Amino acid sequence: MSNVPTNESGYDVIAEVVQRYVDGAKSGRGEDMKPAFHKDATVFGYIGADLFAGPIQQLFDWNDENGPATGLQARIASIDVIDTVATVRLELDNWTGHRFTDLFTVLKVDGEWKIINKVFHLHS
């Protein structure tokens, strides 16, 4: 069960932030997804046996290297909001032929919702 508010301060604004990330994935340009993330955000997950971890710039670079994912399908599975903190589960199909589950920690910083951390699972 998830808490999915339908007001401007919650779900709708957070969904827009996540959509910026998805739009960047579709365009294949890290710069397009960058506004969704806090400047100090991090990313963690495995690609095969290799840990993909560190500053969010690594994700932007990976996205640039892999190019557009025009066939990408994304669905927000859940959003849970507690005042200035939120978590989001995003299901992604056909990102460069792969399926991912992303888990985001989102924080309201200076009045703006920003992704602080992305942890992902690459489905086999």
Please describe what each predicted stretch is.
Residues A41-T42, S124:
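Short secondary-structure capping/turn micro-motifs that flank functional sites
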Residues F37, G45-I47, K108:
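Generic secondary-structure microfeatures
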Residues F37, L92-N94, V119-F120:
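Short beta-strand segments enriched in hydrophobic/aromatic residues
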Residues T6-V13, T42-R99:
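Surface-exposed, charged secondary-structure patches
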Residues K39, T84, G111-E112:
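Beta-strand-connecting loop/turn residues
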Residues M1-E31, P35-K39, F52:
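Short, low-complexity N-terminal intrinsically disordered segments enriched in polar/charged residues
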Residues R99-S124:
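Short beta-strand edge/turn micro-motifs at domain boundaries
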